[in-house]
Amino acid sequence: MTAPVSPSLLAPVANGLVEDYLHQLGKGQPGTFDAMLDGQGQLRPGWQSLLGSLEGLGPTGRHQQHDEIQRLLAENGVIFNMHDETQGRSWRLDPLPWVIDEPQWQALEAGLIQRSRLLSALYDDIYGPKTLFEAGLLPTQELLASAHLILPCHQSLPNDRAPIVFHGVDVIQDTQGQWRVMADRLQAPSGTGLALENRILMARALPDMYRNAPLKRLAGFLDLHHRTLIAMAYQHRDNPTLILLTPGPGSPRYFEHAYLANYLNIALVEGQDLVVRDTQVWLRTLGGLQPVDVILRHCDDAYCDPLELRGDSQLGVPGLLQAMRAGGVALSNALGVGILEAPVLADYLPMLCEHLLGETLLLPNADITTKPATAPVFDSHLQRLEPTTLNLRCFVTRTPNATTKSSTAAKNSAAGEYQVMPGGLAWVGEPGLPSLSSTIVKDVWVTATSPQPHVSQLRQARGPVVATRDGTDLPSRVAESLFWLGRYGERLDTRARLLREALLRLMEYEQDEIADQLLDELLLALDITTLNEEDEQRLQAPLIGFDLKRTALLAQFDDVDPQALQPLFAQLMRNARSVRDHLGDDSWRVVHQLRQRMATFNPSLGASAARRACEGLSAQLAAFFGLCNETMPHHYGWRFMDIGRFLDRVLGLLSLLKLTLNAPHSPGLALWEVVLATTDNFTAYRRRYRSELHPAAILDLLLFDETNPRSVGYMLKRIERQMDRLPGTSSPYRNAERRLLIQANAALHLADIDRLSHLADTPEAQDALEQLLDALIEPLNALSEAISQSHFSHVERPRQLVSMGADA
């Protein structure tokens, strides 16, 4: 209960912010529990130093810290709802955390552990003897009609395994300060990675405030969770293979999946990466099939197995449920736990707790009459604290010594079965509001009475380790995404360079006849045709001449044309997000900067701004791939990305060279100058040949000079060198991609250079060049498909022939 209080009772250092907050509480509903102020209007334990630090920053400092936190959030890629590949929504992280003192936390912690034990026992009965149904202690009709009751999960857990390994619980505080449960999250409990990210960002943005705070750390909990996953393995217990199963980049939680997998040092995989054979789950890698021991799943029950559950699911693994039954793989959590999330169970839990555990339920569920407590959130615009309603997601993990119900820890100490993360994910909104629907999140600080030990992400090895460097454990899907990341990155760069040159000629339009002809050729190279009547109606104006060409060029920044910048960037982002855990932090920051550039550019700013945007885009793409080159291990994943880059680059160069032969306006040497500038060879050419343009010299530089990284010869050599180091079969014969590369190299090396040297004089030389370019383009176009067939997994997924669900 918060009562009126004299400002003099408040600590002077926090007087301004707290006095204003207290005034706002007085205008609200009286008798409301507040997270920061007690019934006498005094700051609760843990808030004093925090508010003092915030007050001491002053308005300017608080505004700067708020902006710094939001910048770090965006920089680290904390983006949600990214169904549009180039857009997304970021949360706003409140610089004022939610402080929970130790007595409050202990009450919540005890209730959370009890709830995990209760739901675990309830699962065992629902999918086991079903005595609760027989005794009338469950709403039989409602549960049997629920789509979350998975009948094939009956007695599916072998070896006395615990069904609930990780448990998310959404709670609020009511007007009396009592913790109440809004929902249980068991199928794909998300938020741990986000809670950890929020904590790390708070420590970076507010180092003094964080360092001086007596709070419990999160790293120990995640280390415990990782050790629990290891302990779950049936086989290979000394070094089990752990994976995190994600729905993929289309999931709004994909950022967290990648972040958590990276933090726990486990592979991030999708359903298509896995296959079940003889009740064993295997991971498809470049080096062959690798056995999987433990799956930390972030897919809902129904989507995990298209053979026995939802037949239309593309997210799961056919046969996964049978593998779980047979003990071929351990799952966190067991399939079927979705029934425990049913809201209809809420009224039965007090009785079930007495029946199954012999205990009184410590955490009651909220109901429609529950009124929420208030808590402060910092408004950076108004520079004050605003009372609001907070939701909190807590996380509970089973301990490593209690992965089976018959273990010593589980038998001797009920409290030892589970541990709670000392913190969580808090968000602003009405009780029960989904976290992704909120716009403001808070870090949660649980006060500690003693200094907390440091927990390293690296652990002391228990025995000898076999060094590995080749990267054969890379999932083939990841290799494919890296390959296409390289291709789309280079394709985007080539188009940006062509646009840059076209926009430069546009700015010189009607001032130089040659420049006008060059602009037409560049529009041809960009595959930009004259706008039709429908386009003119959309633009609400008939366009001719300069306006027509300017509009056509600036339209390349829209998403109308699939080969325009935005769609190409969308493909780049889709592949980058699918390999997020394989990219370094610095590389990902450049990706964020690219995303910002693409999202904020306004074509109405005109040709000059568009040209600068193209230059910046090329520079940032070079920075991204440069960082990948410097920071990624040069094993198979990097090699596939490199092959993709140089394959697309060489095809782009060959297409540009064909343009010089087919140019209807024949602007002559000026077009060769554009080719040199577009391929970034202008400086190298001038250093060798001064200012004189010779087509034969240009061809030598662009086609045959293997010391020039932008020449066809160099790029073919580089692709060949990378392909020589890829995993291959034991066959003595060359595979399809090797034969295609030999074909392209042979065409280049057997070219009649003397004949090509008369390019400017004879049509025969032009015919010879065209034949050479065609002889290069044909096998290189086929090379991409050959690589895909040899190295990337394209497996037809099994489907149900007969429906086997509850709604059958």
Where are these regions (language model features)?
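N-terminal acidic, proline/glycine-rich, low-complexity intrinsically disordered segments
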Residues: M1-L10
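ATP-grasp fold ATP-binding core
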Residues: P158, D170, V294-D301, L349, ...
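Two-metal-ion RNase H-like nuclease active-site motif
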Residues: H167-Q173
